[in-house]
Amino acid sequence: MALLQKTRIINSMLQAAAGKPVNFKEMAETLRDVIDSNIFVVSRRGKLLGYSINQQIENDRMKKMLEDRQFPEEYTRNLFNVPETSSNLDINSEYTAFPVENRDLFQAGLTTIVPIIGGGERLGTLILSRLQDQFEDDDLILAEYGATVVGMEILREKAEEIEEEARSKAVVQMAISSLSYSELEAIEHIFEELDGNEGLLVASKIADRVGITRSVIVNALRKLESAGVIESRSLGMKGTYIKVLNNKFLIELENLKSH
């Protein structure tokens, strides 16, 4: 397959990912097929975002690492000492992706390290490994282009997380601001009683203790439920089951108390 055709296949990853959740496993599989090597997409903290194996490595430690989806801490830290593509590192390199305890088996193992950069910062590392065949210039062009595409997707995912965070916070603030003073007071007592994200409460008991009517509690819960902040379900004589759906709610409630 020609270099241009392989480049187009990598490019299609971007088009396929548009508007969908990022799938690093599929990206790793695509890179495995066009570069013909084992592929590991590793985050800044060593989390294995995606991987695809071309040549199986029979080693218990490696298997556990793939199951846990986590690279060793020291290895991850050392990757930051590689500021640019470093190719064809042998089994004796500290950056080898082959198990050094089986050095004899993987004597011909070669590793290439490609930093994933985006927005001017190091986002992670693309690690490629294969047995015997050296990584040629065409492989490195594809690896660096692949790392750029992965970097763009990591940035997109980060931006979406920030956007979702802001949206969740805004929904909570609007829901809380819609409560009257007595409703807000009722809600504070309810979640003190729950002491967590979900639980059972008896509205009449809280109403008696705080000195408010039961209808105030019901109205407050209804407002939060219609905003999608909580869900509540009546369990008859047992009381009302409440679950927090928006993880920003309890934080905002705590902030209100401290002011």
Curated annotation (Swiss-Prot):
One of its GO terms (biological process) is negative regulation of DNA-templated transcription. The modification Phosphoserine is found at S215. The keyword Cytoplasm applies. One of its GO terms (molecular function) is GTP binding. Pfam families: CodY, HTH_CodY. Residues 1-155 are annotated as: GAF domain. Gene3D superfamilies: 3.30.450.40, Winged helix-like DNA-binding domain superfamily/Winged helix DNA-binding domain. It is found in: Cytoplasm. The keyword Repressor applies. It comes from the Bacteria. Keywords: Cytoplasm, DNA-binding, Phosphoprotein, Repressor, Transcription, Transcription regulation. GO terms for cellular component: cytoplasm. InterPro entries: CodY (IPR014154), GAF-like_dom_sf (IPR029016), GTP_trans_reg_CodY_C (IPR013198), Transc_reg_CodY_N (IPR010312), WH-like_DNA-bd_sf (IPR036388), WH_DNA-bd_sf (IPR036390). Residues 203-222 bind DNA. Its main location: cytoplasm. Belongs to the CodY family. DNA-binding global transcriptional regulator which is involved in the adaptive response to starvation and acts by directly or indirectly controlling the expression of numerous genes in response to nutrient availability. During rapid exponential growth, CodY is highly active and represses genes whose products allow adaptation to nutrient depletion. This is Global transcriptional regulator CodY. It comes from Bacillus velezensis (strain DSM 23117 / BGSC 10A6 / LMG 26770 / FZB42).
